Amino acid sequence: MNHLTGLFGLPASTLVELLDLATGYREGLNREPETFAPLLSNRRIALVFFENSTRTRFSFELAARHLGAGTLSFTAASSSVSKGETLSDTIRNLEAMKVDAFVLRHPSSGAAEFVASITKRPVINAGDGTHEHPTQALLDLLTLREYFGKIEGLKIMILGDILHSRVARSNIIGLKTLGAEIAVCAPTTLLPGRIDQLGVRVFTGIDEALAWADAAIVLRLQLERATGGYIPSLEEYSASYGLTDEKLDRLKRLMPVLHPGPINREIEISNLVADRIQPPGYSSSMLMEQVTNGVAVRMAVLHRLLAK
């Protein structure tokens, strides 16, 4: 593996290797003080973000520092991109400065694969358009594996805006590769055409979807969808598809809940469901576990691509 531009095409053995490596790093993050071998000392990683980010950018920066690497943070607004510089020129100039790897977030689908085609340095996709977000899917896989002890045979339901979600796409690929069953639940306007051909079940009612699933991954609803004709209103979407305690209580069994963030509270997920980390109740929020696992997964990816 020379780059990580997506999970598509990666064998199960590679995903398991990354998850196993991340598990070791997660154990290290639980120790006080955190101490890790400086495997990437004297390496410099360019964090090239053309879109805003909190969790992904900071966790990559922490991951790099834990392994002894330095980081260079790039934002489009404060760079020569604001003066018209192209993506390819930006990458070539950073490469000429002898950076060792690129972590790229970009609004255009396929941007990471394009950058990988013009540089000899490893490229890690931190989210490109509606294409993929591979490290988010890996941290979700790690979170599910920690909770259940396995991935194979699980029934995972992805709830929300499937049509525009790179997180959904990478999760579907990763979960299927490791043997999980997958369902999606959304209004038909937020489902890709012919999604059933991906080998996933399709639900348009949340109660039936929850009854089927072992765990739920809730996606952020981009608020502009309410004015774009995809949903009647935020209120109606929340009433039909928002994950609430009342809907989960009808299951009478515990349901682990994941969300990639940022959260639209009381729209796609209620405060109670987002914040509950243990019973009483029938939901178990895994959101903070996901955040911690994000650092561990990104350490594993940097290790795999850069450690010699």
UniProtKB/Swiss-Prot annotation:
What function does this protein fulfil? Catalyzes the condensation of carbamoyl phosphate and aspartate to form carbamoyl aspartate and inorganic phosphate, the committed step in the de novo pyrimidine nucleotide biosynthesis pathway.
Q: Is the Transferase keyword given for this protein?
A: yes
Molecular-function GO terms, alphabetical: amino acid binding; aspartate carbamoyltransferase activity
GO annotation, biological process: 'de novo' pyrimidine nucleobase biosynthetic process; 'de novo' UMP biosynthetic process; amino acid metabolic process
For this UniProt record, give its keywords in alphabetical order, as a comma-separated list: Pyrimidine biosynthesis, Transferase
Q: What is this protein called?
A: Aspartate carbamoyltransferase catalytic subunit
Which chemical reaction does it catalyze? carbamoyl phosphate + L-aspartate = N-carbamoyl-L-aspartate + phosphate + H(+)
Q: Where does L-aspartate bind?
A: 83, 166, 220
Q: Which Pfam families match?
A: OTCace, OTCace_N
The enzyme class is: transferase
Give the binding site residues for carbamoyl phosphate: 55-56, 105, 133, 136, 261-262
PANTHER family xrefs: ASPARTATE CARBAMOYLTRANSFERASE, ORNITHINE CARBAMOYLTRANSFERASE, MITOCHONDRIAL
- UniProt subunit comment: Heterododecamer (2C3:3R2) of six catalytic PyrB chains organized as two trimers (C3), and six regulatory PyrI chains organized as three dimers (R2).
**GO terms under cellular component:** cytosol
Report the family membership: Belongs to the aspartate/ornithine carbamoyltransferase superfamily. ATCase family.
Pathway the protein takes part in: Pyrimidine metabolism; UMP biosynthesis via de novo pathway; (S)-dihydroorotate from bicarbonate: step 2/3
* Lineage: superkingdom: Bacteria
In short, the EC number is: 2.1.3.2
InterPro entries per record: Asp/Orn_carbamoyltranf_P-bd, Asp/Orn_carbamoylTrfase, Asp/Orn_carbamoylTrfase_sf, Asp_carbamoyltransf, Asp_carbamoyltransf_Asp/Orn-bd
Q: Does the keyword Transferase apply?
A: yes
Biological source species: Chlorobaculum tepidum (strain ATCC 49652 / DSM 12025 / NBRC 103806 / TLS) (Chlorobium tepidum)
